[in-house]
């Protein structure tokens, strides 16, 4: 028995949740993800990130997963629950008691071994292991949230740069109109009032450029903060062209089924239910403390030195741990109710993200396919008529403003589509291009079964 207790007490549990977390994040995000090994002091540039040709969205995500400070804070939970697993695996140290032979007292010695750990240790380790895996699943969702935040920051910065370019193009057109108005006023063809209106509009276009430049600076800093690179001198203004395209004919029902099958936070709550069940089972036995006294030595027995085994245990007379059992059962019930509530929240998030994507795609089709071409044609006609002195400058100016507004709305619609895709992929817990067949219920069921295998076995370590 002593050798068995020694073997159990000295065993060290295997803990590979960090590697598992990195693999899950890479699988869900579709990118090679490297997690930091220790506390970050300097910005780390992953070897697969090349900034010489501009920053791509995928490179921004890789930078962020390596350097995002808030994600590093969340990763500390891995070490915390690793310690909890080690602590649960530990067997209490044996107790040595001795009474010295002073006066009439004989010498006694007793070695107490915690033999209750032989049947309680497996329950404790199982519960702690489930809790650590629950944290891993939660951190996968936290990582997907960080990926979404980085993608949105990248999209916002790219959109701000495009809006700045649209403002510059609009300013050139409006300043050209102001120059024509100035020449006509000097020639006496138009009034001072009309010329002043054109001058004011040209000045306003210059101010709009300044405001757009400020917006670029703001989005740049937000992107650098999301990537954890704000301490670098690199501005990250050179962005690679990146446009995500969702699959055709997305089905909301399929998206909801996939989200319920693979969302990491749902998996974390599910594992939490198993862990609460283990804790409830442990509470029914944890109040029994049994110490094996092996050996118990007496210095002066009837036959001299005598030795023999014994037991020391508490008697469950006044209570049988009813309070802890009730608390554990309440935690179990709470975890089950949280799972139901979380599933409803997932359905809501997926539905909202799906609706936002549909609306953004419709807006982009309208502005890009209809309004911008019509506005460009209108400006071209107005400028040709202006050269022939067949149209008022105010009409040309209004057509120019409408073109600039249409281009800005097109950029905003493009950004909304990209943000909606990022949010929808976060909501379903994975990439849209990894969805099962859109019209096959069998594919969806097989997909759910495949994803459910990624949830750890609650009986395993």
Residue ranges and their predicted role:
Residues 204-234, 338, 360, 374-430, ...:
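Short segments within alpha-helical structural elements
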Residues 66-73, 79-94, 109-127, 137-144, ...:
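A glycine-/polar-enriched beta->alpha junction
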Residues 75, 126-129, 192-200, 393-401:
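Short, charged, amphipathic alpha-helical segments
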Residues 44-53, 85, 91-127, 238-251, ...:
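Small/polar, glycine/serine/threonine/aspartate-rich low-complexity segments that form flexible
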Residues 191, 346, 353, 389-393:
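Alpha-helical heptad-repeat coiled-coil segments that mediate oligomerization/polymerization in large
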